[in-house]
Regions:
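N-terminal interaction/assembly modules
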Residues: 1-88, 92, 139-150
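Short alpha-helical "recognition helix" segments of helix-turn-helix
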Residues: 113-118
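DNA-recognition helix of helix-turn-helix
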Residues: 119-142
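N-terminal positioning helix adjacent to the helix-turn-helix/winged-helix DNA-binding module
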Residues: 81, 96-97, 129
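Short amphipathic alpha helix immediately N-terminal
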Residues: 93-107
Length: 150
């Protein structure tokens, strides 16, 4: 049995990837600063470094390289997901619903900001229009699931 992805879960994957990428960038900055600090300390000492110190520097360099690779993979996954979601939204949704979904799930705006920008009440955009938009998208997601299974 194939699980049909819910529209809101599908769109939230974009934000999840965005958060993961941001966290990895922060970790990369910490590792980069640490590696510069370690190599600077070793250079300032002007003594021959031990193999243990070199191993720590190498291990840090490897972690940095792996993290950069992970970040690039996540960015590519997020871009692919955004492109796919963007195309589905355009095919599925009315202009108002399209605008709401882009503001919420691509620009990560809160409901208050969206309501002001769209000229509606908070309750209307966060409840009624949001549900309508998700329902429109859900129909297309389910249609695509049926096509993919054939």
């Amino acid at each position: 049995m194939v699980k049909i992805v819910k529209a809101e879960e599908y769109l939230k994957e974009i934000r999840t990837l965005d958060i993961l990428i941001e966290e990895n960038f922060e970790e990369l900055e910490k590792l980069d600063a640490l590696s510069k600090k370690v190599t600077s300390t070793l250079s300032d000492a002007k003594v021959q470094s031990s193999s243990a110190e070199q191993s720590r520097v190498e291990a840090c360099a490897i972690k940095i390289a792996c993290l950069k690779d992970d970040i690039l993979k996540d960015i590519n996954r997020m871009l692919d997901l955004k492109k796919e979601a963007h195309n589905l939204i355009i095919k599925s949704c009315s202009p108002k619903c399209m605008q709401l979904l882009f503001k919420r799930y691509f620009e990560f705006k809160n409901w208050e900001t969206i309501a002001i920008e769209m000229g509606f009440t908070y309750q209307y955009v966060s409840d009624k229009l949001h549900k309508r938009a998700l329902n429109q998208l859900q129909k297309n997601l389910e249609k695509n699931e049926r096509v993919d299974r054939s």
